[in-house]
């Protein structure tokens, strides 16, 4: 069994290759080598769908809870970490989980990933401080990476190739459902119970998933595995440390710069230098490891793969900047509840989800994918620019329409690089190529959210000196995002709200920049009809 990877539901080619390529039709017929009764199979499938739903929910459920979290912990400066900590560990450990599934029994390795996810959820739910919450989010990300990779790997050993797309599509639908309901569930818990239930909800549902896998999935020992030295070499622990260390240094520099420390301070410069050094060492180490690297050098040499990865990094950054900061705008500036802010972001998420499905079907029928990337990135940039115009009293028609426009742009382009890569890559390389793209795409989320947070904080502090002179900025930072109208003295409130709008707009400038860069990156692809492409890209 080879490394499993996470794929979108409309990418049938990769779903059929999640264990790696098979050389003959006879081998394909033998792929389903764990036989379960119909009842046991259904219960295992339910367990997998629940696990994917929870892992996917953690991407989105926190967005509407963040303002209340900043109220409780007085941690406005940590907003970027609440998303980035999860993205970093999910991206950095996905390849490691894929290899662990080949080294150890599939059942117990999968249950270990559930344990990590549940442990992180407990830490988040019981977190006494912002730092504890960030640590919990990072542990959740480790578990989520194992759940994504392992769920598709289990499907690969339970059903033959011809039947995998419909079952994997079911898990993909679970991912899409979680994306839509996440902000709604998060907002409802935050408004009516506590934001902590955004994480506690994982415990009973995850427990059911764990129980079904434990009782009904047959344990399968690995066919073969290297010795401990070989395993450590293939797991690339040094690469893991370098990439996590690099991104952590980058985020710390952005968090400190212009807020708690001057941009030219030793701490900020030092962390930026450490980021560059770690990235250089990571690139060298990946090249030196060759086929055992997290990011295979052969993959990056292929134009479609590195351009697709770059585009995915940029468009995902633009998407998450808007997704994470819209609830802050609604709750802090417009003063609505967390549950209402979740409802108000539905137009954006529905537009993304609907367009991903529709464009996937259109590309499958016509074979033309390249134009959708250009159109999608352009619309995303324009939509982000329109959202930039939000002010303290933007009417419903404005924030609904502009969200839909931006969501359409993201939706029509988001999955296109995956489809292009899978259509222009040899079957044997599809899992590795897709894993490379998803690794870089997820890192884009960490970079995008943290960059937007730096822009938000710096602009907020600068504008407060103009719009609310005489008010101590620390009061605003300690107030949290949704407690402004309760904490800020009335004579300063309007000025603080205007400063918040300025900070929000600066976030959108970051999103506009990422969207514009994605538009330019799209031209790096060759115009091709993927229905006529069978050979690997030259």
Curated annotation (Swiss-Prot):
Q: Does the keyword Secreted apply?
A: no
Q: What happens when the gene is disrupted?
A: Leads to a decreased production of conidia and a reduced radial growth by about 20% on potato dextrose agar plates. Also leads to increased sensitivity to the xenobiotics 2,3,5-triiodobenzoic acid (TIBA) and 2-chloro-5-hydroxypyridine (CHP), CuCl(2) and several fungicides including clotrimazole, fludioxonil, vinclozolin, and iprodione. Also increases the sensitivity to potassium superoxide KO(2) and the singlet oxygen-generating compound hematoporphyrin.
The residues that cross the membrane are: 42-62, 78-98, 114-134, 139-159, 169-189, 197-217, 237-257, 265-285, 310-330, 343-363, 370-390, 400-420, 430-450, 507-527
Q: Which domain of life is it from?
A: Eukaryota
> Which family is this protein grouped under?
Belongs to the major facilitator superfamily.
Q: What does this protein do?
A: MFS-type efflux pump involved in the modulation susceptibility to various compounds including the xenobiotics 2,3,5-triiodobenzoic acid (TIBA) and 2-chloro-5-hydroxypyridine (CHP), CuCl(2) several fungicides (clotrimazole, fludioxonil, vinclozolin, and iprodione), potassium superoxide KO(2), and the singlet oxygen-generating compound hematoporphyrin.
Q: Can you name this protein?
A: MFS-type transporter MFS54
Taxon lineage: Eukaryota, Fungi, Dikarya, Ascomycota, Pezizomycotina
């Amino acid at each position: 069994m080879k490394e499993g990877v996470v794929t979108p539901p409309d990418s049938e080619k990769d779903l059929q290759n999640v264990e790696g390529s098979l050389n003959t039709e006879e081998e394909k017929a033998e792929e389903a080598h764990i036989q379960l009764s119909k009842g046991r199979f259904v219960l295992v499938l339910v367990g997998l769908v629940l696990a994917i739903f929870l892992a996917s929910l953690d991407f989105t459920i926190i967005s509407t809870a963040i303002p209340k979290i900043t109220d409780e912990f007085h941690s406005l400066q940590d907003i970027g970490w609440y998303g980035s900590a999860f993205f970093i560990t999910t991206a950095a450990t996905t390849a490691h989980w894929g290899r662990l599934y080949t080294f150890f029994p599939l059942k117990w390795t999968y249950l270990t990933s559930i344990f990590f996810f549940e442990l992180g959820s407990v830490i988040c739910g019981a977190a006494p401080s912002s730092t504890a919450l960030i640590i919990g989010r990072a542990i959740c990300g480790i578990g989520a990476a194992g759940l994504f990779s392992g769920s598709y790997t289990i499907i690969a050993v339970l059903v033959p190739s011809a039947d995998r797309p419909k079952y994997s599509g079911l898990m993909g639908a679970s991912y899409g459902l979680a994306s839509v309901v996440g902000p709604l569930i998060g907002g409802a818990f935050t408004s009516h119970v506590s934001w902590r239930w955004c994480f506690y909800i994982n415990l009973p549902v995850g427990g059911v998933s764990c129980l079904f896998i434990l009782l009904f999935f047959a344990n399968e020992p690995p066919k073969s595995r290297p010795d401990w030295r070989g395993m450590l070499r293939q797991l690339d622990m040094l690469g893991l440390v370098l990439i996590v260390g690099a991104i952590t240094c980058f985020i710390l520099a952005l968090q400190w710069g212009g807020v708690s420390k001057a941009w030219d301070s030793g701490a900020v410069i030092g962390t930026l230098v450490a980021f560059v050094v770690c990235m250089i060492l990571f690139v060298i180490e990946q090249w030196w490891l060759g086929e055992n690297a997290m990011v295979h050098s052969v993959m990056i040499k292929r134009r479609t793969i590195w351009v697709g990865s770059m585009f995915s990094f940029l468009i995902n950054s633009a998407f998450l900047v808007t997704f994470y900061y819209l609830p802050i705008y609604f709750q802090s500036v417009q003063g609505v509840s967390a549950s209402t802010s979740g409802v108000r972001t539905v137009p954006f998420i529905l537009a993304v989800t609907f367009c991903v499905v529709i464009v996937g079907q259109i590309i499958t029928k016509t074979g033309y994918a390249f134009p959708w990337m250009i159109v999608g990135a352009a619309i995303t940039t324009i939509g982000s620019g329109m959202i930039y115009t939000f002010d303290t009293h933007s009417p419903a028609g404005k924030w609904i329409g502009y969200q839909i426009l931006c969501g359409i742009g993201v939706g029509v382009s988001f999955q296109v690089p995956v489809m292009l890569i899978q259509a222009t890559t040899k079957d044997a390389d599809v899992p590795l190529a897709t894993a490379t793209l998803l690794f870089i795409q997820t890192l884009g989320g960490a970079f995008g959210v943290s960059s937007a947070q730096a822009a938000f904080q710096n602009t907020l502090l600068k504008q407060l000196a103009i719009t609310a002179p005489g008010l101590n900025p620390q009061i605003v930072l300690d107030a949290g995002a949704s407690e402004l109208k309760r904490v800020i003295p009335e004579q300063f409130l309007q000025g603080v709200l205007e400063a918040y709008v300025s900070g929000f707009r600066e976030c959108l400038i970051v999103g506009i920049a990422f969207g514009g860069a994605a538009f330019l990156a799209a031209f790096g692809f060759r115009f091709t009809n993927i229905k006529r492409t069978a050979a690997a890209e030259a």
